[in-house]
Amino acid sequence: MKYGEKIVSEFDVEKDLEIWPNEHKRDYLIKMTLPEFSCLCPRSGYPDYATIYLEYTPNERVVELKAIKLYINSFRDRHISHENSANEIYTVLERKLKPKYMKIVADYNPRGNVHTVIEIDSSKL
């Protein structure tokens, strides 16, 4: 097993999703694009691909960039639906960061003539 496969396959969100203190008291928006998300369809086992758009206004914590990359990559061998993967990412980040505002958009590549976009926005909940 290559080192990249090993670190992704052994990623534990509870201990490996590194969170840093936010050193700035002003409000600001962090935007990330994660274009290489993949997981497996829970029904067929076929791969699903998406771009994950994350934006948040931090409170006291921010997520370390390599850690969010590894977390997103840890989905690649999991059988999980579009809805469940987007909601899991949102729930984990909301719990760990406790941001003032957060929005996740999971924009899945079309498969079988269906294009799915899942959006979870704390300002609309």
From Swiss-Prot:
Protein's cellular compartments: Cytoplasm
Active site: 41, 48
GO BP terms: queuosine biosynthetic process; tRNA modification
Keyword Nucleotidyltransferase: no
Principal place of residence: cytoplasm
Keyword tags: Cytoplasm, NADP, Oxidoreductase, Queuosine biosynthesis
MF terms (GO), sorted A to Z: preQ1 synthase activity
E.C. designation(s): 1.7.1.13
Domain of life of the source: Bacteria
Any single Gene Ontology cellular-component annotation: cytoplasm
Enzyme class: oxidoreductase
Stored SUPFAM superfamilies: Tetrahydrobiopterin biosynthesis enzymes-like
Binding positions for substrate per the UniProt entry: 63-65, 82-83
Pathway per the UniProt entry: tRNA modification; tRNA-queuosine biosynthesis
A Pfam family hit: QueF
Gene3D superfamilies the record matches: 3.30.1130.10
UniProt keyword annotation of Cytoplasm present: yes
Reaction(s) the record says it catalyses: 7-aminomethyl-7-carbaguanine + 2 NADP(+) = 7-cyano-7-deazaguanine + 2 NADPH + 3 H(+)
HAMAP family in UniProt: QueF_type1 (MF_00818)
Protein function: Catalyzes the NADPH-dependent reduction of 7-cyano-7-deazaguanine (preQ0) to 7-aminomethyl-7-deazaguanine (preQ1).
Family affiliation: Belongs to the GTP cyclohydrolase I family. QueF type 1 subfamily.
Protein name: NADPH-dependent 7-cyano-7-deazaguanine reductase
